[in-house]
Amino acid sequence: MDPCECSKTGSCNCGGSCKCSNCACTSCKKSCCPCCPSDCSKCASGCVCKGKTCDTSCCQ
């Protein structure tokens, strides 16, 4: 199962009141991908999740 639900639906919620579109949060700084590492303050747009961690090049 793909850890990034938004890659299939194009939208998702990233916790609390955060809303996402195209796998990017529109109202918070964290990526909507739950597999992004917690020390990532923001994941680059178009980030592809592999397994349960983002590639480090996703972090910005």
UniProtKB/Swiss-Prot annotation:
Cysteine pairs bridged by disulfides in the record: none
InterPro entries on file: Metalthion_dom_sf, Metalthion_dom_sf_vert, Metalthion_vert, Metalthion_vert_metal_BS
Keyword Metal-binding attributed: yes
Residues annotated to bind a divalent metal cation 2: C6, C12, C14, C25
Keyword entries, A-Z: Metal-binding, Metal-thiolate cluster
Region annotated Beta, chain positions: 1-28
Protein family membership: Belongs to the metallothionein superfamily. Type 1 family.
Function: Metallothioneins have a high content of cysteine residues that bind various heavy metals.
Protein name: Metallothionein B
Lineage: Eukaryota, Metazoa, Chordata, Craniata, Vertebrata
Gene name of the record: mtb
